[in-house]
């Protein structure tokens, strides 16, 4: 039987406890989980690709069937390159579903092997987003409840650098 391989794509700017929750749960469902960190040119990320990969690695080091890859370009092409079984997406709200449903169907039009798997977050993480976390951190609020310790320290470093 072939191994199951799921891709969890995102910009992860920064990785949050909600992301960690989804990857942890996916690691029990799939043989291999690829955390695919998008370069995200259009989003102008706070953290560089290298920083985001490192923060994800530090935050998920307890999981042994997870790998971390930076990527650019179409997700469906990356899906093929990785010989993936499916793509994992988190759904926090109905508005997420509408967008993800459209995206999954578009990707399936590009490659009929494309499959999307949707997970809802654990209740305590359902409201967390990287955007909200960045805004709280920018205003020097306490984000320790929302992100792994490595991210808290990365924000502290950004503040020391004048952010």
UniProtKB/Swiss-Prot annotation:
Q: State what protein this is by name.
A: Phosphopantetheine adenylyltransferase
From the UniProt record, list the reaction(s) this protein catalyses: (R)-4'-phosphopantetheine + ATP + H(+) = 3'-dephospho-CoA + diphosphate
Broad EC category: transferase
Compartments it resides in: Cytoplasm
**Which HAMAP family does the record match to this protein?**
PPAT_bact
Metabolic or biological pathway: Cofactor biosynthesis; coenzyme A biosynthesis; CoA from (R)-pantothenate: step 4/5
The record's function comment reads: Reversibly transfers an adenylyl group from ATP to 4'-phosphopantetheine, yielding dephospho-CoA (dPCoA) and pyrophosphate.
Q: Name one GO biological process term.
A: coenzyme A biosynthetic process
Q: Which organism is it from?
A: Acinetobacter baylyi (strain ATCC 33305 / BD413 / ADP1)
Site annotated as Transition state stabilizer: where?
19
Spell out the family assignment given in the record's similarity comment: Belongs to the bacterial CoaD family.
């Amino acid at each position: 039987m072939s191994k199951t391989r799921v891709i969890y794509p995102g910009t992860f700017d920064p990785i949050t406890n909600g992301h960690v929750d989804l990857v942890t749960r996916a690691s029990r469902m799939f043989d291999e989980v690829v955390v695919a960190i998008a370069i995200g040119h259009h989003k102008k990320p706070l953290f560089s690709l290298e920083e985001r990969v490192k923060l994800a690695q530090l935050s998920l080091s307890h999981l042994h069937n997870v790998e971390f890859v930076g990527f650019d370009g179409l997700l469906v092409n990356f899906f093929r390159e990785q010989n993936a079984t499916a793509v994992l997406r988190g759904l926090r709200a109905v508005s997420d579903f509408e967008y993800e449903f459209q995206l999954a169907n578009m990707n399936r039009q590009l490659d009929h092997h494309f499959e999307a798997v949707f997970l809802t977050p654990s209740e305590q993480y359902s409201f967390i987003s990287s955007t909200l976390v960045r805004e709280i951190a920018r205003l020097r609020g306490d984000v320790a409840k929302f992100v792994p310790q490595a991210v808290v320290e990365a924000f502290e470093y950004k503040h020391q650098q004048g952010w």
